């Protein structure tokens, strides 16, 4: 497959039938490992916030964060730490988390991955530009702070977040529904593209019938993403253009 300059990239795998057969109305992006690297700000903040809130240390290195939702991660940490997973405890935990994630973002050397800003610019400049949204396991305010740290939050009109569900498939469904409300139409699955860096991102995109892009900048290797059979699998977003995924 060739890029917009005609160069062939062996890092790209595309399905034979993934050419856009109809308009793409909504493109949904995961955040961590897909849009940005935060230098581990989220993981560090989770461990520190749990100890600050409950006086219990939980080894976050034993917990798999990639492709997860914040609410499900909090539930797992409660299980490890012997803390009741109540709404009150969750609210207390995330109040500490947001304070700490700000500190870690300020100290981190993170930023957007290669090709991200160009892709967002290209999508926004298309004649019939799709709406841009988020499909993330972050709580909404955590997402705002992570993307805001790198000037990207205002690029997105809507999103599905951890508040919508602990189940990523249901977050995807919520994001699609919000996209339909934003566009004032009923969206069909193929009118949506989901971009993410883990098998869970690809799976939730398929759950709503969307076209899927696996990008190997975060939680999974290119080979692992290819095994999930997304519509596109790329090393990073420099190897894909807006017209590749949206047509035109």
Feature locations, PLM:
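Asp-based, Mg2+/Mn2+-dependent phosphohydrolase catalytic module
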Residues: 1-25, 85-88, 117, 121-124, ...
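Active-site neighborhood of HAD-like aspartate-dependent phosphohydrolases
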Residues: 4-66, 72, 78-80
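Short, acidic loop-to-helix structural element flanking the phosphoryl-transfer center
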Residues: 15-16, 23, 28, 102-134, ...
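Conserved Rossmann-like nucleotide-cofactor binding loop
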Residues: 34, 41, 140, 200, ...
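Phosphate/oxyanion-binding active-site loops and adjacent basic polyanion-contact surfaces
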Residues: 38, 42, 112, 165-171
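An amphipathic alpha-helix signature
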Residues: 43-47, 71, 75, 94, ...
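A metal-dependent, Asp-based hydrolase signature
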Residues: 66-126
